[in-house]
């Protein structure tokens, strides 16, 4: 997807003189040593680690996009998407929000990896879609971060999900996977200044909408 698939899509865009967007990821920053992460930060990625195939694949895709712009003047856009959640997300995709909600609704123990102090930043899907539309309608190539700059620990997220689902679940802790980022938070000043974009849906409101979806589908 990140190499052959990207090359195929870039070739198609070139053939049809089409604008094309690379939905990149905050994973290109790896386990960052700088907080929050700005777009000019080159990241801290273990190229041989368990997670590196995805990280490096997305970095490769960004490189290919920039190469096609330089060589063929292709009309590209690159955004780096931070953790996103909301209705219609796949329930068993392994992401932390869906995992926590499903475990809480079933009354199962909520599994937190590490001591729960590691952080992420969560944006609601509606905010992301608005950011993507603004990016496609802008003149900016990017990369531009799209994410919520409010940081939350995994323990606090689990506690919030338990409260919002009125669950009897307990929180249990397991070993943190190797190379799992300790902190993740976007600097969105470029998105604010270039796209006039910032997320507007707070986490509790978004989680309520997502929990309602999970309970009715």
Regions found by a protein language model. Name each.
Residues 38-40, 95-96, 190:
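Short, hinge-like loop/turn segments at secondary-structure boundaries
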Residues 88-93:
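Short, solvent-exposed loop/turn segments at secondary-structure boundaries
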């Amino acid at each position: 997807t990140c190499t052959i698939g990207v090359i195929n899509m870039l070739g198609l865009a070139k053939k049809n003189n089409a604008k094309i967007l690379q939905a990149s990821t905050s994973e290109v920053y790896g386990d960052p040593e700088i907080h929050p992460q700005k777009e000019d930060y080159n990241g801290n990625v273990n190229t041989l680690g368990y997670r590196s195939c995805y990280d490096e694949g997305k970095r490769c895709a960004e490189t290919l996009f920039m190469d096609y712009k330089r060589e063929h003047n292709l009309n590209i856009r690159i955004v780096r998407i931070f953790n996103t959640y909301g209705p219609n997300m796949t329930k068993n995709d392994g992401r932390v929000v869906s995992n926590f909600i499903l475990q809480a609704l079933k009354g199962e123990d909520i599994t937190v990896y590490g001591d729960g102090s590691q952080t992420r930043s969560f944006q609601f899907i509606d905010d992301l879609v608005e950011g993507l539309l603004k990016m496609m309608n802008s003149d900016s190539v990017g990369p531009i971060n799209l994410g919520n700059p409010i940081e939350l620990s995994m323990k606090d997220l689990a506690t919030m999900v338990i409260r919002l689902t009125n669950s009897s679940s307990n929180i249990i802790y397991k070993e943190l996977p190797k190379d799992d980022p300790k902190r993740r938070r976007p600097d969105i000043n470029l998105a604010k200044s270039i796209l006039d974009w910032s997320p507007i849906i707070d986490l509790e409101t978004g989680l309520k909408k997502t929990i309602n979806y999970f309970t009715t589908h």
